[in-house]
């Protein structure tokens, strides 16, 4: 299925220029006010082509621009467009890939202020002024067909207004629509019969009109004849359509079997929990819609106000949605909602006053840059994916194994008089010292501050062989001299390289 695979955001709020690789399930991690929400707003604007306020344009002398590349576009999906639009947009889809660009310089919501273009594959240079064209009609229709719905759940929006009102622009309205669309299809005939019963009672052409309406018709006819002979007047109250009925839907709550009450009476935590419960419902009941289109779900801090157990439930729901027609992007401060499988592709966001919002290299990108052999890449990925805390830390301390992991946090607490999580320090155990250098280089590529804590044998078995230390280093030579001295005292044996080894006679370990 197709995916919004790459997004480039330019001149949008805190973002000067930012390029992101997206997946069907993409976590975004960063400090407060680093620009995570701005990324989501930019993607939402690109998909909905909605209003752009003045504060959304970083530099007023240039347009805000979002460029998105969609991969995996199937012929079947394009065939759902009308024939004219198929012919117009078809040449711009190469090997299932198509790139759109949305830009706007003046703030406002008018459609004429926005320009949506498509990348012309015949022009190789993307910086060429003709690389993106507005000529083919059907560009907006094609993008809307690929992503007909963008659901954006913000962290600090008014959940009361959102959940209590089912409007097409509200989160609850969009969620209810996703959940009820299959219901409408499944029960369409029953609903039509019920509406038909109402229509027969109150419409002007109803065959079972209520007596009071018939009386109104009679009196109206008598009076209208005096002014317009031959004219008949009937009271008409149209029955609601199926869409009218579902459009009015909202949610109410009851507690311990009491009467239903308005959602606004709940606390913020309960309100947020209900929003997330709707997401879980969507993952269970809203997946049977027969459509090749993908929907985009954007969530800020899905863990907000939730109990840790509820966070795990929500995580599973989001995973399930990402495998059933939804592309999910969320910003989080919680390691609980990110699994080991997600660490490699998690987007890490930072911000400076001069350059605005930027991203660090992901674990997967850094591994590929540092380690060229595929089999060794897998080993390094596994090592660094053992702790989701890595994504949230200011500093990492790489250690050789699990023994150090049990001991060092306790020592850190005693020495610093702080818990490791208070200082945003994370200890990452590796399976021995063999991957220490690669792991350190990967973290350096990611621009993550870190230290390596190793046993003494690392100096001889790894550091000297990898060129980190010279064999003639004075400290190395001093230690070898000590080894020889202790050997003469019968404390242990030495191997051919002058390093301690097990004493076979006394069975004393090195």
Where are these regions (language model features)?
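Switch/connector loops and helix/strand junctions flanking conserved nucleotide-binding motifs
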Residues: 74-80, 110-114, 160-164, 338-340, ...
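Flexible phosphate/Mg2+-sensing switch loops adjacent to catalytic phosphate-binding sites
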Residues: 48-68, 76-81, 284-292, 329, ...
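Glycine-rich phosphate-binding loops of NTPases
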Residues: 38, 74-196, 260, 373
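Acidic, divalent-metal-binding catalytic cores of TOPRIM
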Residues: 351-510
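Short glycine-/polar-rich loops that comprise or flank the Walker A/P-loop
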Residues: 61-66, 96-98, 146-150, 326, ...
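Switch/communication elements of ASCE P-loop NTPase nucleotide-binding domains
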Residues: 1-48, 246, 252-389, 405-406
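Extended helical coiled-coil dimerization/tether regions that scaffold
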Residues: 159-166, 174-299
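Short alpha-helical segments and helix-capping/turn motifs at coil-helix boundaries
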Residues: 48-53, 127-143, 234-237, 260, ...
């Amino acid at each position: 299925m197709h995916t919004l695979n790459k997004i480039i955001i330019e001149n949008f709020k805190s973002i000067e220029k930012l390029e992101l690789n997206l997946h069907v399930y993409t976590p975004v991690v960063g400090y407060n006010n680093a620009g995570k929400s701005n990324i989501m707003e930019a993607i939402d604007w690109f998909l909905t082509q909605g209003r752009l306020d003045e504060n959304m344009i970083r530099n007023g002398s240039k347009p805000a621009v979002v460029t998105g590349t969609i991969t995996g576009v199937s012929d079947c999906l394009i065939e759902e467009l009308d024939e004219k639009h198929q012919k117009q947009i078809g040449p711009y889809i190469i090997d299932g890939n198509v790139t759109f660009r949305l830009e706007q310089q003046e703030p406002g919501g008018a459609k004429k202020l926005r320009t949506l273009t498509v990348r012309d594959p015949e022009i190789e240079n993307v910086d060429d002024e003709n690389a993106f064209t507005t000529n083919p009609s059907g560009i907006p229709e094609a993008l809307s067909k690929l992503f007909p719905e963008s659901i954006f759940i913000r962290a600090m929006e008014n959940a009361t207004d959102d959940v209590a009102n089912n409007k097409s622009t509200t989160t609850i309205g969009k969620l209810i629509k996703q959940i009820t669309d299959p219901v409408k299809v499944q029960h369409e005939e029953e609903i039509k019969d019920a509406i038909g019963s109402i229509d027969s009672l109150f419409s002007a052409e109803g065959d079972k009109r209520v007596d009071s309406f018939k009386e109104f018709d009679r009196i109206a006819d008598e009076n209208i004849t005096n002014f317009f002979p031959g004219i008949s007047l009937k009271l008409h109250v149209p029955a609601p359509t199926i869409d009218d009925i579902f459009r009015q839907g909202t949610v109410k709550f009851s507690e311990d079997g009491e009467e239903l009450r308005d959602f606004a009476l709940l606390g913020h935590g309960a309100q947020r929990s209900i929003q997330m419960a709707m997401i879980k419902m969507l993952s269970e009941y809203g997946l049977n819609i027969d459509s090749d289109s993908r929907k985009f779900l954007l969530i800020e801090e899905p863990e907000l106000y939730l109990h840790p157990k509820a966070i795990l439930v929500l995580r599973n729901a989001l995973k399930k949605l990402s495998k059933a027609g939804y592309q999910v992007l969320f910003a989080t401060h919680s390691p609980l909602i990110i699994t080991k499988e997600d660490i490699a592709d998690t987007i890490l966001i930072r911000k400076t006053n001069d350059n605005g919002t930027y991203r660090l290299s992901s674990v997967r990108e850094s591994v590929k840059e540092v380690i060229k052999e595929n089999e060794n890449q897998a080993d390094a990925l596994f090592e660094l994916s053992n702790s989701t805390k890595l994504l949230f830390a200011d500093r990492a301390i790489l250690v050789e194994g699990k023994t150090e992991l049990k001991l060092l946090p306790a020592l850190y607490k005693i020495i610093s008089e702080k818990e490791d999580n208070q200082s945003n320090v994370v200890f990452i155990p590796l399976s021995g010292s063999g991957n220490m250098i690669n792991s350190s280089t990967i973290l350096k590529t990611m621009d993550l501050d870190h230290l390596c804590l190793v046993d003494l044998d690392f100096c001889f078995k790894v550091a000297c062989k990898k060129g980190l230390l010279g064999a003639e280093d004075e400290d190395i030579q001093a230690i070898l001299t000590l080894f020889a001295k202790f050997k003469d005292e019968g404390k242990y044996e030495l191997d051919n390289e002058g390093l301690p080894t097990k004493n076979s006679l006394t069975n004393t370990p090195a």
